[in-house]
């Protein structure tokens, strides 16, 4: 067994602090990775603070982080896809049952027995899995992704969650040239949603509660920006959207956006506020509108998304921070003060 430097939280009220965690020796199908960057997803914060206690209670200590990129340092004897030195990524999943219909279809993200990168039972070491706020990780090669060589590694890290979570529903619901697409919430997920919708050829409208993000939204690829607190500006778009991606992390009025859908339009929730959202039947029935959800993506589609990013030169706009600033970053995340994803430089763990 190896040990790895990491940052963990001991309780839902504790800050993240330096610790040491065990990592297994690589088995025959395993890849050992030196983690170089890890994005900070709002899901990390929800989990550290046990905000999803009803659905997935947090086991402490927790080491979050599921937007991992790094270099392969060692591979097991049966590994065929990777060799030491390769640039790789690990997202939200590190295992699944591999036999259920969803796994067979490459939709491991919907496997009933999936192992999340952190806070899932660890089949190898007991306890729970530990995520990417650490300097190394060992993962079965099936759950390791290849990062295109032209992509900046810090900017590529958020693709592993924010990227696939926004790419997958857009592909599923047919976002293409000529479609009018809304993105609600210009945070980590939202800014990736804007980049993908634009790259897929759609007409893109950002809805934000932060007027100061207008210029950035346009720079990121939006054709139009609506400050969602402006009722008149909202009304101008009533009944016009083919697809809306809702990436808001907190309680909000989802009906205000459902009302903007055209006949048969679709609003997909990817944001995961802890409390249920109230949905007006009238918003849905007046226009045969659809409300759906989506959770990250399967392994084949995650690789497809990374390759798409390689071809289109798409990365996340990141603010790189040392791990010692992680608690401050969480407070800024709560104030929607991030442009547009924090990426932890794990070299900073060396001084711990
Ligand atoms: P984030 O970077 O914090 O962005 C969230 C954005 O939501 C903020 O920047 C803000 O955008 C908007 N917002 C925040 N509070 C709001 C409020 N009270 N009312 C209206 N808008 C508000 O978070 P993220 O990492 O992108 O994650 C977003 C959500 O998706 C989280 O709940 C996360 O857990 C979830 N998630 C889901 C999946 C999945 O697979 N489904 C994967 C990853 C994350 P503006 O300033 O533009 O208004
Ligand atoms: Zn995430």
Question: Which stretches of residues belong to each language-model region?
Answer:
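NAD(P)H dinucleotide-binding glycine-rich loop of Rossmann-like/cofactor-binding domains
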Residues: 57, 81, 97-184
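Rossmann-fold NAD(P)-binding glycine/threonine-rich loop
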Residues: 271-287, 299-305
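Short N-terminal strand-loop motif that marks the start
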Residues: 1-69, 131, 135-139, 225, ...
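C-terminal hydrophobic helical "lid"/dimerization subdomain
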Residues: 2-4, 299-352
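Glycine-rich Rossmann-fold phosphate-binding loop(s) that bind the pyrophosphate
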Residues: 162, 185-189, 272
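Glycine-rich beta-strand-centered segment in the early N-terminal region that forms part
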Residues: 24-38, 52-104, 109, 148-151
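Helix-to-beta-strand junctions that scaffold the AdoMet/dcAdoMet cofactor pocket
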Residues: 261-262
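Adenosine-nucleotide cofactor-binding segment
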Residues: 177-186, 196-256
């Amino acid at each position: 067994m190896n040990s790895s430097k990491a940052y963990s939280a001991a309780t839902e009220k504790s800050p993240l602090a330096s610790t040491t965690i065990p990592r297994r020796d690589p088995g025959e199908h395993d890849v050992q990775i030196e983690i170089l960057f890890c994005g900070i997803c709002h899901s990390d914060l929800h989990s550290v603070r046990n905000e999803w206690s009803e659905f997935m209670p947090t086991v402490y200590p927790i080491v979050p982080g599921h937007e991992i990129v790094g270099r392969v340092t060692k591979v097991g004897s049966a590994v065929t896809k990777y060799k030491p030195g390769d640039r790789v990524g690990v997202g939200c999943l590190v295992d699944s049952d591999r036999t259920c219909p969803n796994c067979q279809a490459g939709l491991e993200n919907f496997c009933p027995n999936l192992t999340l990168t952190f806070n899932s039972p660890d089949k190898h070491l007991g306890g729970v899995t530990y995520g990417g706020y650490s300097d190394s990780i060992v993962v079965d090669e099936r759950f390791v992704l290849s990062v295109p060589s032209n992509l900046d590694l810090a900017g590529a890290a958020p693709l592993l969650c924010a990227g696939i979570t926004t790419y997958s529903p857009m592909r599923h619901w047919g976002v293409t040239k000529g479609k009018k697409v809304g993105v609600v919430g210009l945070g980590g997920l939202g800014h990736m949603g804007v980049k993908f919708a634009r790259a897929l050829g759609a007409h893109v409208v950002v809805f934000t509660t932060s007027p100061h993000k207008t210029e950035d939204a346009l720079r990121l690829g939006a054709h139009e920006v609506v400050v969602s607190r402006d009722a008149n500006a909202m009304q101008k778009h009533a009944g016009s959207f083919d697809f809306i991606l809702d990436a808001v992390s907190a309680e909000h009025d989802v009906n205000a956006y459902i009302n903007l859908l055209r006949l048969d339009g679709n609003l997909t929730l990817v944001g995961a506020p802890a409390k249920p959202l109230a949905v007006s039947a009238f918003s849905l029935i007046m226009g045969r509108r659809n409300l759906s959800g989506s959770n990250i993506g399967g392994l084949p589609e995650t690789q497809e998304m990374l390759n798409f990013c390689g071809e289109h030169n798409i990365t996340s706009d990141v603010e790189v921070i040392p791990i010692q600033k992680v608690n401050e970053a969480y407070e800024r995340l709560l104030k929607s003060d991030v442009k547009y994803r924090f990426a932890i430089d794990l070299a900073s763990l060396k001084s711990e």
